[in-house]
């Protein structure tokens, strides 16, 4: 499928899927990577982001499936001990594997500023990073700066318009 831009994996979890990117965010909400209609959908990158992860902030979406598939496992990060056991997210792209270290975990509204993209490495971005790190359910002891590129893994919760977010910075 030409919409495939990479692979996402969190070792020791069920999260290991192709990453999709298309001009229609709603398409992969209910289509598999093989473009078959399916309520589980796919894991996909925000349409407004570059598919090569060149943005300072890239957002990745996936459903919170009752059977534990897709991004259902993200909710386990509400426990600090789970983060200790699973601290990194790996993204395989055309230019190699990129390791991301988790620095913040929290719930937010679907229309939250947590979904802001299009940053430059300036004071606005630095303030944004400080804000989202401060929202974490617990201290991750990971430092994030305006020179860091980050990803947000986003899934729905049982609380209406709330989303569960796991934010990670690139760790080279």
What label would you give each PLM region?
Residues 107-129:
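Glycine-rich, pocket-lining loop/helix-strand segments that form or immediately flank
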Residues 140-164:
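Short, active-site-adjacent segments that bind or coordinate small-molecule cofactors and metal centers
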Residues 1-45, 50-55:
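N-terminal pre-domains immediately preceding structured catalytic cores
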Residues 35, 41-114:
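Mid-length scaffold segments of soluble, non-membrane domains
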């Amino acid at each position: 499928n030409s919409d495939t831009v990479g692979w996402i994996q969190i070792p020791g979890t069920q999260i290991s899927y192709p990453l999709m990117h298309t001009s229609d965010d709603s398409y992969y909400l209910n289509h598999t990577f093989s473009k078959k209609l399916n309520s589980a959908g796919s894991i996909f990158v925000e349409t407004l982001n570059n598919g090569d992860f060149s943005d300072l902030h890239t957002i990745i979406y996936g459903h919170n499936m009752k059977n534990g598939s897709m991004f259902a496992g993200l909710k386990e990060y509400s426990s600090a001990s789970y983060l200790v056991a699973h601290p990194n997210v790996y993204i395989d792209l055309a230019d190699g594997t990129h390791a991301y270290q988790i620095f913040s975990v929290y719930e937010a509204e679907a229309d939250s500023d947590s979904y802001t993209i299009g940053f430059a490495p300036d004071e606005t971005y630095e303030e944004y990073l400080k804000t989202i790190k401060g929202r974490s359910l617990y201290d991750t002891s990971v430092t994030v700066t305006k020179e860091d590129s980050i990803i947000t893994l986003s899934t729905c919760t049982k609380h209406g318009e709330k989303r569960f977010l796991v934010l990670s910075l690139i760790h080279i």
